[in-house]
Every structure is written in C-alpha cells, then in structure tokens.
Regions:
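A beta-strand/beta-hairpin structural motif
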Residues: 58-60, 138-160
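N-terminal secretory signal peptides that target proteins for export/translocation
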Residues: 1-16
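Structured domain cores in non-transmembrane regions
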Residues: 71-143
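Bacterial N-terminal signal peptides
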Residues: 15-33
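Glycine-rich, aromatic-bearing surface loops/beta-hairpins
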Residues: 154-212
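Boundary at the C-terminal end of the N-terminal hydrophobic targeting segment
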Residues: 34-41
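Short, well-ordered beta-strand segments enriched in hydrophobic/aromatic residues
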Residues: 55-65
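Short structured motifs
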Residues: 41-47, 67, 103-105, 154-159
Length: 212
C-alpha cells in the first residue's frame, strides 16, 4: 500500500512539475517582444489535374517557421498542422454542395536523445503521443521535415464521375497550425504571437480545361 501511494505521489509530482514548466514557458512566450521574423505561409503552386478517373490536387507551400515556434519545438513541444481541400459546386438556392474532400494531419516533434526530427503524417487526426495509424519519418534537420509538409502532391479530392463539366465548381484549400492541439497555456499565449497564427486559405475555380 505504501509503495502504491509513493508511486502515485511521484507521478503527481512529475505531472505538476511538467505543468509548471509549460506554464512558465507559455508566460515567457506571451511576455516576450515580437520577433523581427515571424512564421509565414503562402503558395507557389495550386493546381488540379485529371488522372485515372480522379481529380488530383497539387500544392506547393512557401512555409517558414519563426524563431519563437522553432524555439518551442526544440524545447520539446510537438506542433500539429492540418491541410484540408474540398471540391464544391455552386448552388444559388442553397449551400454549396460538397463533391469530395481530403485532409492531411501532421505532427512535428524534436527528439532530443537522437537530435532528429520526427514527422507523423495521417489522413486522420493524430493523438498527442503521435501513436496512430500514421506514416512516421525521421529527419536530420528541421528544414528536411518542413520540405515534406510543403509538398502536397497527387491528393485525390474527388471522383471525376461526380464532376459536372457544365456546372460551376471550385476547390477550397486551407492549411493551418492546429492551436487546439497545444497545451492549454500555449493556446492562450499563442493568440498574442504572430508565430503561432499560421493559417492560409485559397480557392481555385475549376474550368473545362482542367477537368476534361
């Protein structure tokens, strides 16, 4: 019985110390001056193509992580990103109709013991631990890991059988840093830091040349 109580006390103490550490780091982040260079996201490529009865999406992001975000990663904070794409059809009499969609979830974390970067990629939300039915890759540098996130190629967003060549349709795309996956103190502090407000949305009108 004594051993059980001791184990619980040690676990509680560890969790308390970890919570205090995150609270302190979040407070320092909120009070820190704005960095001259901040995180940014833009697009250098956004196009679709028809292949084997499917409509495929190709995106090339111009993604840069600011110093505050990189610093948090190096200190052990895992960061989650989400990319969503939907094919929609205009309807003047009701909400636009969704014809297809695709999502990708990314979890980026630094492994201090091996000094390597781990990136998990999945079509489903990734747990905080990163343990899920996801593809896991390890990289020597942060740049290599970010390059994988930047290149989003041959994503199937819809079946061509659902595309009406005579209708008005478009692809809506969004990429963002998922703040909801951060520890609660960081969620509050992130609102004051441009580094943590990574969010880009674009739309592409489908033309007959793209889908024929």
């Amino acid at each position: 019985m004594t051993g059980f109580i001791t184990h619980c006390w040690k676990s509680a103490g560890f969790n308390l110390r970890r919570c205090c550490r995150w609270l302190l780091w979040a407070w320092l982040m909120a009070c820190a001056p704005v960095w001259a260079q901040t995180s940014s996201a833009d697009m250098s490529e956004f196009k679709v193509e028809r292949q084997d009865g499917s409509l495929l999406l190709n995106v090339q992001l111009k993604l840069e992580l600011g110093p505050a975000l990189e610093d948090a990663l190096v200190k052990g904070l895992a960061v989650h990103f989400v990319a969503d794409a939907e094919v929609m059809r205009d309807r003047w009499y009701w909400y636009d109709k969704k014809l297809g969609m695709v999502s990708r979830y990314y979890r980026l974390a630094y492994q201090p013991l091996t000094r390597r970067w781990r990136l998990n990629v999945s079509s489903e939300p990734i747990a905080h631990s990163g343990v899920t039915s996801s593809l896991s890759q390890n990289f020597e540098s942060l740049r290599e890991a970010i390059d994988v996130i930047r290149r989003q190629t041959s994503w199937k967003v819809a079946d061509m059988s659902d595309i009406d060549l005579d209708a008005r349709q478009y692809v809506a795309y969004r990429f963002r840093l998922d703040v909801s996956q951060l520890p609660r103190p960081f969620q509050i502090a992130a609102g004051n830091q441009a580094d943590w407000r990574l969010d880009i949305a674009r739309s592409l009108r489908l033309t007959s040349d793209m889908v024929r």
